[in-house]
Amino acid sequence: MIPTYMNIMLAFTISLLGMLTYRSHLMASLLCLEGMMMSLFIMTTLIALNTRSPLTNIMPIILLVFAACEAAVGLALLVSISNTYGLDYIHNLNLLQC
């Protein structure tokens, strides 16, 4: 396997392990999720460059749009929780409660 792909998969795995380790804090979870999205973006960009197919050129852009939307929603939740409770614990995020 090419070392570049191995490094990107290692970055994704480390971000996934960080997400599993720091799942109680929203800020750490969002940072790990961004690391996962960036490694997926780089991987899809490299695949699109290597295949040279016009159909795969749009995939990294779509992934980047979804990553930006995810970051905006995550930061909005973080600001809302920190203003309400003063902490960024995920267990404070109980939106189903009336």
UniProtKB/Swiss-Prot annotation:
Catalytic activity entry: a ubiquinone + NADH + 5 H(+)(in) = a ubiquinol + NAD(+) + 4 H(+)(out)
Subunit structure, as described in the record: Core subunit of respiratory chain NADH dehydrogenase (Complex I) which is composed of 45 different subunits.
Function: Core subunit of the mitochondrial membrane respiratory chain NADH dehydrogenase (Complex I) which catalyzes electron transfer from NADH through the respiratory chain, using ubiquinone as an electron acceptor. Part of the enzyme membrane arm which is embedded in the lipid bilayer and involved in proton translocation.
Keyword Transmembrane (UniProt): yes
InterPro entries, per database record: NADH_UbQ_OxRdtase_chain4L/K, NUOK/Mnh_C1-like
Protein name: NADH-ubiquinone oxidoreductase chain 4L
Phylogenetic placement of the source organism: Eukaryota, Metazoa, Chordata, Craniata, Vertebrata
A Pfam entry, by short name: Oxidored_q2
Segments traversing the membrane: 1-21, 29-49, 61-81
Location within or outside the cell: Mitochondrion inner membrane
Family, per entry: Belongs to the complex I subunit 4L family.
A GO biological-process term: ATP synthesis coupled electron transport
UniProt keywords, alphabetically: Electron transport, Membrane, Mitochondrion, Mitochondrion inner membrane, NAD, Respiratory chain, Translocase, Transmembrane, Transmembrane helix, Transport, Ubiquinone
UniProt membrane topology term: Multi-pass membrane protein
GO cellular component: mitochondrial inner membrane; respiratory chain complex I
EC number, as in UniProt: 7.1.1.2
UniProt GO MF annotations: NADH dehydrogenase (ubiquinone) activity
Keyword Membrane attributed: yes
Signal peptide from the UniProt entry: none
Principal location class: mitochondrion
